[in-house]
Amino acid sequence: MQDQIFFEDVIEGQEITSLEKKVTTVNILMYLSTVWLLDRIHFDYPFATQRRGLPNVVAPGNMAGDYYVELLNGWVGEKGDLRKLAIQFRSFMVPDEILVCGGKITKKYIDADKGYVELDLWIKNPDNINCVPGKAVVELPRKGRKEA
Protein backbone atom coordinates (compact mmCIF):
# COMPACT_ATOMS: atom_id res chain seq x y z
CA MET A 1 0.00 0.00 0.00
CA GLN A 2 1.23 3.44 -0.93
CA ASP A 3 1.74 6.17 1.70
CA GLN A 4 -1.00 8.78 1.94
CA ILE A 5 -0.59 11.47 -0.70
CA PHE A 6 -1.58 15.05 0.12
CA PHE A 7 -2.83 17.92 -2.01
CA GLU A 8 0.35 19.88 -1.32
CA ASP A 9 2.51 16.99 -2.62
CA VAL A 10 1.22 16.99 -6.20
CA ILE A 11 1.89 19.33 -9.12
CA GLU A 12 0.16 19.94 -12.42
CA GLY A 13 1.72 17.85 -15.18
CA GLN A 14 2.71 15.07 -12.79
CA GLU A 15 1.85 11.49 -13.72
CA ILE A 16 0.38 9.24 -11.07
CA THR A 17 1.61 5.72 -10.32
CA SER A 18 0.39 3.43 -13.09
CA LEU A 19 -1.42 0.12 -12.74
CA GLU A 20 -1.02 -2.91 -15.00
CA LYS A 21 -4.00 -5.16 -15.65
CA LYS A 22 -3.93 -8.37 -17.67
CA VAL A 23 -7.18 -9.10 -19.45
CA THR A 24 -7.97 -12.82 -19.47
CA THR A 25 -10.97 -14.84 -20.52
CA VAL A 26 -11.32 -15.99 -16.91
CA ASN A 27 -11.43 -12.49 -15.43
CA ILE A 28 -13.86 -11.41 -18.15
CA LEU A 29 -16.15 -14.33 -17.22
CA MET A 30 -15.82 -13.56 -13.51
CA TYR A 31 -16.70 -9.93 -14.17
CA LEU A 32 -19.67 -10.87 -16.37
CA SER A 33 -21.04 -13.14 -13.65
CA THR A 34 -20.92 -10.39 -11.04
CA VAL A 35 -22.71 -7.79 -13.15
CA TRP A 36 -25.10 -10.19 -14.91
CA LEU A 37 -23.91 -9.12 -18.33
CA LEU A 38 -24.67 -11.89 -20.79
CA ASP A 39 -23.78 -10.46 -24.21
CA ARG A 40 -22.10 -13.28 -26.15
CA ILE A 41 -19.38 -11.02 -27.60
CA HIS A 42 -17.73 -11.20 -24.19
CA PHE A 43 -17.42 -15.00 -23.89
CA ASP A 44 -18.33 -16.80 -27.15
CA TYR A 45 -15.33 -16.67 -29.51
CA PRO A 46 -17.06 -18.00 -32.66
CA PHE A 47 -20.00 -15.66 -32.12
CA ALA A 48 -17.76 -12.64 -31.47
CA THR A 49 -15.43 -13.26 -34.41
CA GLN A 50 -17.64 -14.84 -37.06
CA ARG A 51 -21.04 -13.31 -36.39
CA ARG A 52 -19.98 -9.90 -35.11
CA GLY A 53 -16.64 -9.50 -36.93
CA LEU A 54 -14.66 -8.72 -33.79
CA PRO A 55 -10.97 -9.61 -33.41
CA ASN A 56 -11.64 -11.76 -30.33
CA VAL A 57 -14.05 -11.87 -27.44
CA VAL A 58 -13.91 -8.43 -25.85
CA ALA A 59 -13.90 -7.24 -22.28
CA PRO A 60 -17.00 -5.27 -21.30
CA GLY A 61 -16.33 -1.55 -21.38
CA ASN A 62 -17.44 -0.98 -17.81
CA MET A 63 -14.54 -3.19 -16.71
CA ALA A 64 -12.35 -0.23 -17.69
CA GLY A 65 -14.29 1.96 -15.28
CA ASP A 66 -13.49 -0.49 -12.51
CA TYR A 67 -9.82 -0.43 -13.48
CA TYR A 68 -9.89 3.36 -13.12
CA VAL A 69 -11.58 3.14 -9.72
CA GLU A 70 -8.86 0.72 -8.58
CA LEU A 71 -6.13 2.99 -9.98
CA LEU A 72 -7.49 6.18 -8.41
CA ASN A 73 -8.50 4.73 -5.04
CA GLY A 74 -5.03 3.23 -4.72
CA TRP A 75 -3.45 6.59 -5.52
CA VAL A 76 -5.57 8.87 -3.31
CA GLY A 77 -5.20 6.60 -0.27
CA GLU A 78 -7.55 6.16 2.66
CA LYS A 79 -8.09 9.87 3.24
CA GLY A 80 -8.67 10.80 -0.40
CA ASP A 81 -11.87 10.42 -2.41
CA LEU A 82 -12.82 9.91 -6.02
CA ARG A 83 -15.40 12.61 -6.77
CA LYS A 84 -16.01 12.32 -10.52
CA LEU A 85 -15.12 9.87 -13.28
CA ALA A 86 -15.96 10.12 -16.98
CA ILE A 87 -14.79 7.63 -19.60
CA GLN A 88 -15.14 7.07 -23.35
CA PHE A 89 -14.98 3.68 -25.04
CA ARG A 90 -12.74 3.95 -28.12
CA SER A 91 -11.11 0.56 -28.69
CA PHE A 92 -11.56 -3.03 -27.58
CA MET A 93 -9.81 -4.65 -24.65
CA VAL A 94 -9.18 -8.29 -25.54
CA PRO A 95 -7.84 -11.34 -23.68
CA ASP A 96 -4.10 -11.76 -23.21
CA GLU A 97 -3.42 -8.03 -23.40
CA ILE A 98 -1.55 -6.30 -20.63
CA LEU A 99 -3.09 -2.87 -20.21
CA VAL A 100 -1.40 0.08 -18.54
CA CYS A 101 -3.76 2.34 -16.62
CA GLY A 102 -2.42 5.76 -15.77
CA GLY A 103 -3.14 9.41 -15.38
CA LYS A 104 -1.71 12.90 -15.42
CA ILE A 105 -2.65 15.83 -13.22
CA THR A 106 -4.06 18.64 -15.34
CA LYS A 107 -5.28 21.02 -12.64
CA LYS A 108 -5.33 21.43 -8.88
CA TYR A 109 -7.42 23.88 -6.92
CA ILE A 110 -8.95 24.63 -3.54
CA ASP A 111 -12.70 24.99 -3.13
CA ALA A 112 -14.40 25.41 0.26
CA ASP A 113 -11.02 24.69 1.88
CA LYS A 114 -10.83 21.26 0.19
CA GLY A 115 -8.07 20.24 -2.23
CA TYR A 116 -9.20 18.96 -5.62
CA VAL A 117 -7.15 17.49 -8.44
CA GLU A 118 -8.29 16.97 -12.04
CA LEU A 119 -6.67 14.24 -14.12
CA ASP A 120 -6.58 12.98 -17.67
CA LEU A 121 -6.64 9.18 -17.67
CA TRP A 122 -5.64 6.43 -20.06
CA ILE A 123 -5.80 2.69 -20.46
CA LYS A 124 -3.20 1.83 -23.08
CA ASN A 125 -3.01 -1.51 -24.85
CA PRO A 126 0.26 -3.11 -26.06
CA ASP A 127 0.04 -1.01 -29.25
CA ASN A 128 0.04 2.13 -27.04
CA ILE A 129 -3.54 2.93 -28.07
CA ASN A 130 -5.64 4.62 -25.41
CA CYS A 131 -8.60 2.22 -25.44
CA VAL A 132 -10.66 4.10 -22.88
CA PRO A 133 -9.65 7.72 -22.28
CA GLY A 134 -11.05 9.32 -19.19
CA LYS A 135 -11.12 12.27 -16.86
CA ALA A 136 -11.42 12.33 -13.10
CA VAL A 137 -11.66 14.68 -10.16
CA VAL A 138 -10.32 13.52 -6.82
CA GLU A 139 -10.22 15.15 -3.44
CA LEU A 140 -6.94 14.89 -1.57
CA PRO A 141 -6.43 15.64 2.11
CA ARG A 142 -4.59 18.85 2.95
CA LYS A 143 -1.63 18.92 5.30
CA GLY A 144 -2.20 20.42 8.71
CA ARG A 145 -5.99 20.20 8.52
CA LYS A 146 -8.20 17.91 10.48
CA GLU A 147 -10.08 15.67 8.06
CA ALA A 148 -13.67 14.67 8.73
Positions of predicted regions on the chain:
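Hydrophobic residues in beta-strands and at strand termini
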Residues: 23, 89, 138-140
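Mid-chain, well-packed structural core segment of small domains
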Residues: 74-95
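HotDog/MaoC-like acyl-thioester-processing domains
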Residues: 1-15, 95-148
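Residues that form or immediately flank small-molecule/cofactor binding pockets and catalytic motifs
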Residues: 21, 92, 110
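Hot-dog-fold acyl-thioester-processing enzymes
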Residues: 1-81, 143-148
